[in-house]
Swiss-Prot record:
GO terms for biological process: lipid A biosynthetic process; lipopolysaccharide core region biosynthetic process. InterPro entries: LpxK, P-loop_NTPase. The keyword Nucleotide-binding applies. This is Tetraacyldisaccharide 4'-kinase. It comes from Rhodopseudomonas palustris (strain ATCC BAA-98 / CGA009). Transfers the gamma-phosphate of ATP to the 4'-position of a tetraacyldisaccharide 1-phosphate intermediate (termed DS-1-P) to form tetraacyldisaccharide 1,4'-bis-phosphate (lipid IVA). GO terms for molecular function: ATP binding; tetraacyldisaccharide 4'-kinase activity. Pathway: Glycolipid biosynthesis; lipid IV(A) biosynthesis; lipid IV(A) from (3R)-3-hydroxytetradecanoyl-[acyl-carrier-protein] and UDP-N-acetyl-alpha-D-glucosamine: step 6/6.
Amino acid sequence: MREPGFWHRPPSLVSRLLLPIAAIYGNIAAARMQKAGTTVGVPVLCVGNYHMGGAGKTPTTLALVALLREFGETPVVLSRGYGGRLQGPVQVDPSRHSAADIGDEPLMMARRVPVVVARDRTDGAALACALGATVILMDDGFQNPALTKDASLIVVDSHRSIGNGSVFPAGPLRAPLPLQVARTDALVVVGDGTAADGLAQQITTKGGVVLRARLVPEPASVEALRGRRVLAFAGIGDPARFVATLRDSGVEVVEQRAFADHHPFTAEELAELAAAAKRDGLTLVTTEKDLARIGGAQQALGVEIVPFAVTLAFGDEAKLRLFLLDRLNGARAAKLAGRR
């Protein structure tokens, strides 16, 4: 879905006209969020958003995977598998599954960490535990009440923040903001913008943790594009941020194409991109997530598509480590006490 422009502008007439529907949607979402969830035998850490679209959940999840492994943990990622056809629960196998089966993000992450896809998150958690998980990382699912969460980390872009602050469809929020803030343990602010400063203050006031982070291009990706003129395309939550990251890395972006988040590229669209690149002597570059959706279709194009990989770097990693250790220890103590 491509986000309406008015979501990221001050409240407009269109937004105000949609407020009655937003109130109904918000009440339903709030009631659902407050339902009791199933408690799992291992800590459950949720990485989510307040709003529709992306803000950097997947890089955040992978960064947490790396830290948890340093602690000696065995993390397994649990995903709904947005955009995939399989109901699950199923462990993602990159050699067997496609993005059409299990979604682009699970497929991309499964090359680095065990990933379970399940529409029913309780069933998915059971499979994750059977695979030996000592910690479950929920990729999205903050508003889903199926599992009791031991910590919720919310990712927000520092330039876009939460848009006009209204609930869908008047704005991008998935549920009323006060309820979401109340259930947030840590806010991960990605980038050097100031749009999320007010939100960060709300989290600090309620006793939550604010973590600053930035997306860092992997050196190999930058080197692969050195001296090349590129046509950048992406179907993610914020394609403009992808292009900005490329340019900030010194990549010469000559042309760009933006698609809706999780866009299923057709053969015709890919052929048009390939033709444009050949015509103008450009290199096609996209995100790892987009390349996961394209899959084997690129082989028929006759041109190379270069994935541009990024990782998330935290400004105060020690603060994050303390937060994670505190939550893991607290969760385990509570679960142990509950079994007595």
